[in-house]
UniProtKB/Swiss-Prot annotation:
Residues 1-20, 296-452 are cytoplasmic. It comes from Drosophila melanogaster. It is found in: Membrane. This is Protein tipE. Pfam families: TipE. The gene is tipE. Preferentially expressed in the central nervous system of developing embryos, weaker expression is seen in the peripheral nervous system. In pupae and adults, expression is seen predominantly in heads, body and legs. GO terms for molecular function: sodium channel regulator activity; voltage-gated sodium channel activity. It is a multi-pass membrane protein. Residues 42-274 are extracellular. The chain crosses the membrane at residues 21-41, 275-295. Its main location: membrane. Glycans are attached at residues 72, 102, 108, 212, 237.
Amino acid sequence: MGDEQDKRTGKEKLLFYTTAFFILLGTFSLFAFLFLVPFVIEPAFTTIFMQFEEVPALCETYDTEIYYGAKNCSWSSCREGCTKDIYTCTQIRVNYRLNLYNFTDEFNFTEYHINLKEAERILPPVKRTDRYERALRSDYEYDNLGGGTGLDIDLGAGRMEQLNFGDADGSNGYLIEDSEDTRGLSASGTLISDERRPFDEISELNEGLMGNRSMYYYVGARLFPNVKGCGYPPMLNCTIWLKRYTKIGMKFPCYYSKVDPSLVISDLDYWQNTLNLVYSMAIPIPSFIISVIYLTYAYFKIYNEDEETAPLDKNAEDMDIDDIDAVDDSDGAVLADNVAGSQIINMDSTTNDSCLEGVLPNGGPGMTASISQGGSVTTPGPYIAQSPAGSQMTPNSEINSFGHQLKVQMADELSRDSLENGAISTSNSVQGNLSKTMTTSISTPPGPTAAV
């Protein structure tokens, strides 16, 4: 019994902790999924749907404006916090040309930013030699760290500025314009005076897709660090990001959207984007579904079976007590119903002999059979109620009581027939060492009792 109780207790504990675990798992999975939707899942899907070109383009900062007030800040190039309202915004617009490889001499620059297949890194020599005339090795300019290289590019009627790329200036390998004309610009490169801008000749009417009539593929594109234009430190620090890209004339690789060419981002990693999307959906959603399935099964199957087969000890004791009370009540009802068929022993006060008296079904005294010594006088004595079997009422005793009632009823009918013809008494005596006389009397209340 003790082993069964311990086994049952261990099973209940295991069931309790398992249920608690799945409840917590489902709760945290749901909240984690709701948290990841605006910060990871939605930006990842948007990045895929916007179809950004994996081959970087050459971007050049065209305009930088700082606005104040919620009405003026319809968009911002970078903001920390994707859900809060913005009251100060920096808007950066860029011009970009397609295929950065056509404007760089070495592939180590692009390999620093993106990982392309070997086939994508090989370009036909015709495209490269037609663009510019290769410079002699002695014409290259090397910086102190040996990471920079410069070249001159002839573009028909115009001459492109000298481009240096490397990590010496802390630009993380971005193309930097080697120009000393920074007057009228703040530390971040934002124009704060009325002096001429490098691109004043380009009017706003000329913004958009340029086609073949311009050296730029698109003019006035909006620049963002990612597709949502927002983030949180340390992944994205807008202060550092703005210092890097707000300077007018800054050249750097960028990625434009095939769906919306006016949208340009500075960083793109499709592999990491897909990986984040898979993790944010493959972990919370199955965990939540498994938790719901288990809790549903436990509620409709496990706990219902336990309640039917193995109730708690306290409830079991209460049920046992109720069953005992119900049995007592039913036995009392049976005794009350069968009281007409019970037997009463009439004790003789003078001789201490017993007299067996039957009670008719109508509740009155009926046929009485007394057993006494010869010559004794039978007088009424105290009544002792006794069941026909002399024990507690059982199904067998109920059957015996029914038979006794039938016999008493038949004797009552015979007695009534005898009373109609007169008083009939019978007496039988047995002679022997002990002389006993059986006396039978039939009486009906409230009339006198006929005795023989």
